[in-house]
Amino acid sequence: MRVSLLTNGPGELWGWVRPVAMELRRRGHSVSLWLLPCPFASGHEREAASLLGVDKLEGPSGGPGLWRAMADERTDCVIQLGGDMLFGARIARSARAPLLCYTYGPKKGLKGARVFTAFPSQARAIPGARAIGDLVKDALLLDAAQSPERGCPTLPHGTAGRDWSRPGGGGRVLFLPGSRPPIRRAALPWLAAARAALRARLPEAEVRTLFPPFVPEAELREWDDAGLRPVRAPAGLVMRDADFALTQPGTNNFELMHCGVPSLVVAPESFLDLIPIAGLRGVLASLPLVGRGLRRAAARRILNRWNGVIALPNRLTDRRVMDELYGDVTPEQTASRMAEDLSDAEGLARAREELLALSGQGGAAARLCDAIPAEDGSA
């Protein structure tokens, strides 16, 4: 059977597509992967996708050429794993193939697709969706079993390995600056200041900074020079060694949840101009006079939709299982909150238990592949 996968951003590619592609290959299916246009792209998606062993790789590209190429795709099933549903519908309609979609929340274009999501609370917010577990958890399990012999892609590692020591009470703290180069560039001095302020409060605290697989060595050296000890290794291996994490809203919130890592999720207002916005709103937000106001309005809409909650695991429950800060937040305020959290041993233990309780079972990729209609029309 031929299966076409569509995705856009770096989190979806490595956290969703990877386990699904591995499972499809294990079942003997032919897999084509389309990398869609994405304002959130890191620039290294094609390099990462080349490790997945798919039979056909297209993109990232846009414009009329992409649209025409999709009309020529011959496939038995389309699975959309991120991106505008317009693209998945295009291939499904041209190939007369069923369209499946995996998403964390409601989005335009789901009508006509079979929709799957990770958690029951998400399914309740998406009409007709079925909760099958989190693909990100399957990706972390791939990290733990990573080897070419087992069909899992091997990643390049950075110069600074996972050389945690056992500090005398300060804790092992993992910084996650994200996959988008503009945000990482702005985050370097900000996180360096946060590390210095944290060490002033907890001298024994040991900081490492986790990077996506294909961050250039030159950039890693900049972070190492700033004392932030970069680590370029599978998230599923590094996160399990951490006592605490500092991150931003995004897919890695769920990675940390599955690994049971207590975390502080921070969204400083000073980074607002660096956050990409998709579609026409993104074009308008880039205008010099009105752009910042539009970004602030977009941020307010998101906060209002989730009652002011920014950490993804906190949106699954009425409890604050991850600490969070947003608004006019400074590195010093962030360090102070981290020091408070790290000094509360009972609170950390409780957070680990609550995060792991939310995690659920693995196997989402297998369940999604089980839902692919057979060639005789059965599922």
Indicate residue ranges for each PLM-predicted region:
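Nucleotide-activated sugar donor-binding and catalytic core shared by glycosyltransferases
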Residues: 1-379
